[in-house]
A protein has these predicted regions:
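A membrane-cytosol interface segment of integral membrane proteins
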Residues: 282-321
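A transmembrane-helix-recognition feature enriched in membrane-embedded lipid enzymes
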Residues: 79, 266-277, 305-320
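Peri-membrane helix termini and adjoining interfacial loops of integral membrane proteins
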Residues: 6-13, 101-111, 157
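Specific transmembrane helices
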Residues: 30-109, 127-139
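Short, charged cytosolic
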Residues: 2-9, 45, 49-63, 144-160
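Membrane-embedded catalytic scaffold of the fatty acid hydroxylase/desaturase
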Residues: 80-92, 102-104, 114-288
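Cytoplasmic juxtamembrane interface segments
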Residues: 12-20, 51-74, 116-117, 231, ...
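Short, strongly hydrophobic alpha-helical membrane anchors
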Residues: 1-25
Length: 321
């Protein structure tokens, strides 16, 4: 019995390690080797434009960032959330296809079969655009809620508690937020897929390159890994009204209250521009990161996992007196 239990734990750990490592070779993931390389090229461009005297390697991999306590929290949460994906999220990914099927069924029962169906090319283009825009819009809206609603902020605060940024800070999120994000992705995928399945007579497909949504692929190539970094890559002013640049996202992480709740878009800056939360790179100088002067509150995996619950406990305890 004990041996079987140990074997189960070993298999789960092995699966978690393999899933974590797979991110570097999965073209759908931001830290795929190709996107890391293009981010390094863009970082070299920023380096050459600056007056930094140290070597490029020292500029890109400073010990104070990559070996900081903040970074090790990033690494541990990246691994821990891989475990959460296997145990809690992975088994339910298939619900996206169920939602798509029942959305298609609902439309068919309610309106009958469409008199005219979208062509393959139309479906290919429109489905890809719809998935990209709606995913980004709802990502923005949920992100907005994370910042505006105290209950959700206590969980999202974990992401903002990073005092140094590196590409793995992308995965520095509380498991509760991870679950919310995955529910959002599953719902958007299911509903949009079901609608297009209905209107295309089941000829649904999307524009992909290397198995990745082509718009997501372009986004990842354009230095997505520099969003969580010390490399201040800025886009031309006109482009920053459309797409969030890496430095604009770094502004979002600033511990300056002036920039709290700014630049919350995932890919597109349009939502920020429309709702008044957009800040352009040129208007901002030096920034630093974090949410609390006492950084020891967030310097370990366990502290980050328990932080929201401790806050709720003290809130309830205080209000029961």
């Amino acid at each position: 019995m004990l041996f079987e239990y140990i074997k189960e734990i070993y298999n789960l750990l092995e699966e978690t390690i393999l899933l974590s490592l797979s991110y570097f070779v999965n073209a759908n993931k931001r830290i795929h080797i190709l996107y890391l390389l293009t981010s390094m090229l863009l970082a070299f461009y920023v380096y050459k434009k600056s007056s930094i005297k140290s070597s490029f390697i020292k500029y890109l991999f400073p010990k104070k960032i990559w070996l900081s306590k903040s970074a090790f929290v990033d690494y541990s949460l990246f691994f821990f959330n891989s475990l959460i994906k296997i145990v809690l999220i992975g088994p339910y990914i298939i619900f996206g296809f169920y939602i798509a099927f029942y959305t298609d069924e609902f439309l068919t029962v309610t309106f009958g079969f469409p008199k005219e169906s979208l062509g393959i090319t139309q479906t290919l283009v429109l489905y890809t655009i719809a998935l990209t825009i709606l995913n980004d819009l709802f990502s923005y809206l949920i992100h907005l809620c994370m910042h505006k609603l105290p209950f959700l902020w206590e969980f999202h605060k974990i992401h903002h508690s990073a005092t140094f940024l590196n590409p793995l800070t992308q995965y520095r999120i509380h498991p509760f937020e991870l679950i919310i994000n995955n529910i959002r992705s599953i719902l958007i995928f299911g509903i949009v897929t079901g609608i297009f399945d209905y209107f295309s007579a089941h000829q649904i497909d999307k524009l992909v390159f290397l198995g990745v949504n082509v718009f997501h692929f372009i986004f990842l190539l354009l230095g997505a890994n520099l969003r969580h970094s010390h490399v201040k890559l800025k886009y031309p002013k006109f482009l920053e009204y459309i797409l969030i640049s890496p430095f604009q996202h770094q502004i979002h992480h600033s511990n300056n209250p002036k920039y709290f709740g700014k630049n919350m878009g995932s890919k597109f800056a349009l939502w920020d521009w429309m709702l008044g939360t957009l800040v352009l790179s040129k208007s901002v100088g030096r920034i630093s990161f974090g949410v609390d002067k006492d950084t020891s509150k967030f310097d370990s995996l366990l502290k980050n996992l328990l932080s929201p619950f401790k806050t709720f406990f003290y809130f309830v305890k205080r209000n029961l007196k």
